[in-house]
């Protein structure tokens, strides 16, 4: 059936005008909630909603709930860029995007309910909100809701998140493939997502039949800052004999990697000639002190786009099965990791040509 005939059929059965039905199916803002509901129900009953709504977002107002720091680029550049990706994904649609700051845990439930029960709120995206009570309330309200980089432990809400465990495993596996065996992981374990990365790193150790010893292979940072990691690595170098130093550092974030590199350089160690450094993320710092970082990129910019697409599908098929979309990371090989050849010493790193 052609689009024109579909619109005419829906208009006939709902008693609405052709122009109203067309505006609803196009996701236009100048339609009432009552009209939108009638058109959606009729289109669904006729079995034409999915075909007609492809590429459209059948709502006019969306709220993004996120920790307060997510709205400040200097406080949390990762979440800030995720929000930008949500904005970009919504550009083709006439959707009013609003924001509400919530704590990750122990969030203000009354504030959340007030925003969710606002007649202008048709759907929500929850970015990095771990509070299980908020997840319960989101289910009770019943409006379409998608989680980003967090999870509903009761498995009721759809989610989009990086595959943190696989990302951690992939990063560690690359270092092993480059010949490294003594790898020190510098991680902040403040959130369960970082624990998942550590679990993946342990998986890589196990795949190599190596024993992971936290006293030798893990430095736990208090935060994700460059200053904290620099101090941590500096103290480690002061307390560790030169013969016992690792061949590589696997660092769990951009700014942490910057701090780690600075700590190594302050101690007179070169990257990667003396110690290799690999990062997870590395979107924000392409080069640190002229050292282009090898890294596994977390799929930051894809999170917003995929969340909007998932929300679109929930609007079309609200009774569809609920699940979590795990996004893979991407390995970006640059110059901060050297290859170690077993039994032949390290592969030399030369920045000058043979005849320079």
Label for each model-derived stretch:
Residues 1-58, 354-356:
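N-terminal helix-turn-helix DNA-binding module of bacterial transcription factors
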Residues 234-356:
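Flexible loop/turn connectors
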Residues 107-121, 228-244:
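Short, well-structured alpha-helical segments in soluble
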Residues 42, 85-89, 137, 196-208, ...:
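Alpha-helical structural signal in soluble globular domains
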Residues 68-81, 99-107, 160-170, 186-234, ...:
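Hinge/beta->alpha junction and helix N-cap segments in small-molecule ligand-binding domains
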Residues 120-128, 182-188, 219, 241-253, ...:
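Periplasmic-binding protein-like
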Residues 2, 59-173:
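Alpha-helical recognition/docking segments in bacterial nutrient-uptake
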């Amino acid at each position: 059936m052609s689009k024109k005939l579909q619109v005419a059929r829906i208009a006939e059965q709902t008693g609405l005008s052709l122009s109203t039905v067309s505006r609803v199916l196009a996701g236009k803002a100048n339609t009432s909630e009552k009209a939108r509901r009638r058109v959606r129900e009729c289109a669904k009953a006729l079995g034409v909603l999915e075909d007609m709504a492809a590429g459209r977002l059948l709502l006019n107002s969306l709220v993004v709930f996120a920790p307060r720091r997510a709205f400040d680029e200097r406080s949390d550049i990762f979440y800030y860029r995720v929000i930008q990706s949500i904005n970009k994904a919504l550009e083709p649609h006439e959707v009013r995007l609003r924001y509400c700051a919530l704590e990750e845990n122990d969030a203000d439930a009354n504030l959340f309910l007030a925003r969710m029960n606002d007649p202008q709120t048709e759907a929500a995206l929850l970015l990095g909100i771990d509070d299980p009570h908020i997840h319960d309330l989101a289910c009770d309200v019943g409006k379409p809701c998608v989680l980003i980089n967090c999870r509903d432990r009761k498995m009721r809400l759809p989610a989009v998140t990086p595959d943190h465990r696989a990302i951690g495993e992939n990063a560690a596996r690359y270092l092993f493939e480059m010949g490294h065996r003594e790898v020190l992981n510098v991680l902040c374990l403040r959130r369960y997502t970082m624990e998942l990365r550590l679990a993946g790193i342990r998986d890589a150790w196990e795949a190599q039949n190596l024993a992971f010893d936290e006293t030798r292979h893990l430095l736990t940072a208090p935060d994700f800052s460059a200053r904290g990691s620099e101090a941590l690595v500096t103290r480690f170098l002061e307390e560790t004999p030169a013969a016992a130093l690792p061949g590589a550092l696997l660092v769990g974030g951009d700014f942490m990697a910057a701090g780690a590199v600075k700590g190594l350089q302050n101690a007179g160690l070169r990257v990667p000639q003396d110690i290799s450094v690999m990062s997870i993320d590395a979107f924000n710092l392409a080069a640190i002190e002229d050292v282009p970082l090898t890294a596994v990129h977390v799929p930051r910019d894809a999170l917003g786009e995929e969340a909007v697409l998932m929300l679109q599908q929930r609007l079309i098929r609200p009774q569809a099965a609920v699940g979590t979309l795990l996004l893979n990371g991407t390995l970006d090989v640059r110059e901060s990791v050297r290859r170690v050849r077993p039994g032949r010493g390290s592969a030399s790193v030369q920045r000058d040509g043979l005849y320079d």
